[in-house]
Design a protein with these regions (language model features):
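Short, charged, surface-exposed interaction patches
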Residues: 1-193
Length: 193
């Protein structure tokens, strides 16, 4: 008899990546730079206050568009230059990141509107401890497959021998659901004869 055994386990992500983005507009490049730098400093200071270190924080090169040079100048453009700044957190402090997300509204009082709705500004959560749980999951999948095989043997009034062949399926790690992307479901299916 050839059977498949399933093992699933829920784990919490141990790495979080969060691109924090804001936009700034101006008609003067030096003034745009000063306001971008001031807001970046405020965000970094806020992140430090929450408990993140410089090793967790990366400031990317800003993306600056000259709307006049791109032919958008139809006389209705109020600001010539538009900049998008991204400050990224890459951290193992997943719980701290989740708590900080709820406090980001505090930056509004400093005149900073954080863009969190765009696809590129959503936090990403990773689980990198697969090797720690792999042996137990393979064991659970094997036991599950054996239970299925025993049921086959019992229902057909047969006896079950030792494993002739076994293959471990591919491990998959996916979010448990869309509301808690930091909880991961690890899954493996083993095939046994």
């Amino acid at each position: 008899v050839t059977v498949k055994g399933l093992a699933e386990k829920e784990v919490k992500a141990n790495i979080a990546i969060w691109p924090i983005q804001f936009n700034q507009v101006d008609n003067d490049l030096p003034s745009l730079y000063k306001s971008m730098q001031a807001k970046t400093d405020i965000i970094v200071k806020f992140l430090h206050k929450q408990g993140f270190t410089d090793s967790d924080i990366t400031i990317s090169q800003p993306s600056i568009d000259d709307r006049q040079a791109q032919g958008y100048d139809s006389g209705n453009i109020k600001f010539r230059y538009s900049a998008q700044v991204t400050i990224s957190l890459y951290t193992s402090k997943v719980d701290l990141l989740l708590a900080t997300q709820n406090k980001m509204v505090q930056l509004v009082k400093d005149g900073i509107a954080i863009s969190n709705q765009s696809y590129g500004a959503r936090p990403e959560f990773l689980y990198t401890g697969l090797n720690d749980i792999k042996p137990q999951m393979v064991q659970a999948a094997t036991q599950n497959a054996r239970e299925v095989a025993l049921k086959f043997a019992k229902d057909s009034d047969s006896s079950l021998g030792k494993i002739k062949t076994a293959s471990q399926g591919q491990f998959s790690i996916s979010p448990r659901d869309s509301n808690t992307p930091y909880i991961k479901k690890v899954r493996v299916v083993s095939t046994l004869t």
